[in-house]
Amino acid sequence: MTDLTTHDLAQPGWQTRDHLNDPVVGELCNRFGPDAFTVQATRTGIPVVWVKREQLLDVVTFLKKQPKPYVMLFDLHGMDERLRTHREGLPAADYSVFYHLISIERNRDIMLKVALAENDMHLPTVTKLFPNANWYERETWEMFGMAFDGHPNLTRIMMPKTWEGHPLRKDYPARATEFDPFELTKQKEDLEMESLTFKPEEWGMKRGTENEDFMFLNLGPNHPSSHGAFRIILQLDGEEIVDCVPDVGYHHRGAEKMGERQSWHSYIPYTDRIEYLGGCVNEMPYVLAVEKLAGIEVPDRVKTIRVMLSELFRINSHLLYISTYIQDVGAMTPVFFAFTDRQKIYDLVEAITGFRMHPAWFRIGGVAHDLPRGWERLLREFLDWMPARLDTYVKSALQNTILKGRTQGVAAYNAKEALEWGVTGAGLRATGIGFDVRKWRPYSGYENFDFEVPVGDGISDCYSRVMLKVEELRQSLRILDQCLKNMPEGPFKADHPLTTPPPKERTLQHIDTLINHFLQVSWGPVMPANESFQMVEATKGINSYYLTSDGGTMSYRTRIRTPSYAHLQQIPSVIRGCLVSDLIVYLGSIDFVMSDVDR
């Protein structure tokens, strides 16, 4: 039985805590001794424990085999610690690697950290304990240079094979003008062309058996069913998929590196573009994490407005997913229906925020401006329209026997497999685990809303995943109706020195406010040195921001964990033995965009 009461809503999220009273810290100390760990006090809301490198595998194994085990590796990445000035009480480190684990039964997390010296960047792989560590370790090596001993294929994943250097190191340039001018010599051109030559062995695949050769097929990176710049290399025996390797990174824009050279405030527009369909949903975890650093508690009106915008974008994203999923199976009409409905949402979003897809409207401490006059009428008209329209999608397409025959039982996995691969969102809930952050770990006032979490019957297949999204749409409509009926009165910004920008109306009356306004608009707010973390239930699964402040106007390290990255890594384990046509349906059922994968 999962304990949903372990996250104390009365405890301020911005309070710095060491979590020494968390049971898992006591369990670790009892097993390995108190001297084996350094517990770091942060504003992440979870225990952060530094572990000795030689004990890493033992500690991770212990946590995974405990009663109420830590069964999901939620995230794994690194940090360049060399320029960090506020490291009081922490182990000496030039670099560090963190492992974020989740226990579903406890509804609790723990973050393990390992300190590394620049002259010894080796540590053991955890891929035998958590298979989804594969891509995370590859990316961490690529971005920082840590070598994970025993990794099955430690190669570049985001950057081209010929790329030189580790981009997230502090001594790696962040701007194109800091590089030497690019010159494409004949030698370099030949090298680049050679790197594009397909060699199955480099991808971990066999050319054939003793009796026959396999056929290899490139699906993407410009195939309509790959849903973006995404390539899958298929190893085929006839129509059967013997093996496949997803190839990502074509949409990589260095979003985490950008976080190190933008102010806390000016980075908000970038969050919209991590997953470009989610809009304000993607602003939420970043803004909440910054507010934890700042110690800001926002008014109830701000919380409810943020929930309302998030649910509008959730419906908007789900409509596109459902309609393109149906299109992948072979029906065209629902796509045109969906774009008509999505237009109504965009009109409403534009009336409130002034923008459509990428509003960049949430602010540190509030929102950009108050709700406009007449917003209630627009929202009521949409709520009156959408329920019957949703029934039309179900009756006209999703109950179609041909669609059911193409999707039921296809690309199926159970709860254990979902947790091993870090699956979240509807894919996980279809297996029977109702992990929805809005319910399990409420944020922005979600605890005040009455809604249900749709859950499947134990197996997540292509049909159950899309039907769960339909039910989630209905629940989002319930939440919007409550926002309409119960919108609190009050300010749209918190009265706090780090609210950015501060309330404009007081700048000409109070010198303190004028100074804050001038500094925060010109340089950006200065956040206290600390670490914070926030996860939210985004449109495609759990999205999170892990921020490190060194007491400046910019983030020292911005780590963005997106759901689509984990979901694409799972593809080979699910689709082996299926047909190419099944893969097309499976891709349509995942609900991903490549900006969310590649960041």
UniProtKB/Swiss-Prot annotation:
Residues 1-189 are annotated as: NADH dehydrogenase I subunit C. GO terms for molecular function: NAD binding; NADH dehydrogenase (ubiquinone) activity; NADH:ubiquinone reductase (non-electrogenic) activity; quinone binding. It is an enzyme of class 7 (translocase). GO terms for cellular component: NADH dehydrogenase complex; plasma membrane. Pfam families: Complex1_30kDa (PF00329), Complex1_49kDa (PF00346). It is found in: Cell inner membrane. It is a peripheral membrane protein. Its EC number is 7.1.1.-. InterPro entries: NADH_DH_suC (IPR010218), NADH_DH_suCD (IPR023062), NADH_Q_OxRdtase_suD (IPR001135), NADH_quin_OxRdtase_su_C/D-like (IPR037232), NADH_UbQ_OxRdtase_30kDa_su (IPR001268), NADH_UbQ_OxRdtase_49kDa_CS (IPR014029), NDH1_su_D/H (IPR022885), NiFe-Hase_large (IPR029014). It catalyses: a quinone + NADH + 5 H(+)(in) = a quinol + NAD(+) + 4 H(+)(out). Residues 213-599 are annotated as: NADH dehydrogenase I subunit D. The keyword Repeat does not apply. The keyword Cell inner membrane applies. Keywords: Cell inner membrane, Cell membrane, Membrane, Multifunctional enzyme, NAD, Quinone, Translocase, Transport, Ubiquinone. NDH-1 shuttles electrons from NADH, via FMN and iron-sulfur (Fe-S) centers, to quinones in the respiratory chain. The immediate electron acceptor for the enzyme in this species is believed to be ubiquinone. Couples the redox reaction to proton translocation (for every two electrons transferred, four hydrogen ions are translocated across the cytoplasmic membrane), and thus conserves the redox energy in a proton gradient. In the N-terminal section; belongs to the complex I 30 kDa subunit family. NDH-1 is composed of 13 different subunits. Subunits NuoB, CD, E, F, and G constitute the peripheral sector of the complex. NCBIfam families: NuoC_fam, NuoD, PRK06075.1, PRK11742.1. This is NADH-quinone oxidoreductase subunit C/D. It comes from Pectobacterium atrosepticum (strain SCRI 1043 / ATCC BAA-672). The lineage of its organism: Bacteria, Pseudomonadati, Pseudomonadota, Gammaproteobacteria, Enterobacterales. The gene is nuoC.
